[in-house]
């Protein structure tokens, strides 16, 4: 085995959750408040950050929420949607093989660490991962520092021996 440290994203890599959760969450939140999402909603939200998207939905759909309460409700909606998410084919077998070969693995995700733990536990694969890093703020996945932190915490120092 060439790579000794493995850094996985959860959504879209290990779990089939991109469409169900991340594309479906705004629709589900709007329906919770009796609103009908417009057909162009996904395209409209695509280039917005979380805060800008929240402001847009509150304003355009007249939601009776503050930004703070919006994010609280959105966490609930996302948690409910994650209950339907399944593993992608072959994931369990691959993780077991990597573990048997002595690989150290972690999760680096934009999803809240607590939510990741819940999903990974429900799917029976949490035991494969040493830790979960929330890629937010300074440690965002668009910056290599988050991956260097993960590699270091996995006991690695050589990026060539680490798979992302």
For the regions a protein language model found, what residue spans apply to each?
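Helix-loop "lid/cap" segments that line or gate small-molecule binding pockets
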Residues: 26-30, 49-64, 119, 150-151
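Metal-dependent phosphoesterase signature
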Residues: 37, 56-93
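Hydrophobic alpha-helical segments typical of transmembrane helices
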Residues: 24-25, 41, 53, 57, ...
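Substrate-recognition "cap/lid" segment bordering the active-site pocket of phosphatases
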Residues: 84, 112-163
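Short, acidic loop-to-helix structural element flanking the phosphoryl-transfer center
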Residues: 2, 79-107, 113, 117, ...
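Active-site neighborhood of HAD-like aspartate-dependent phosphohydrolases
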Residues: 1-43
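Short helix-capping segments at alpha-helix termini
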Residues: 31-36, 61-65, 124-128, 155-156
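Hydrophobic "anchor" residues on beta-strands that sit immediately upstream
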Residues: 5-7, 106, 163
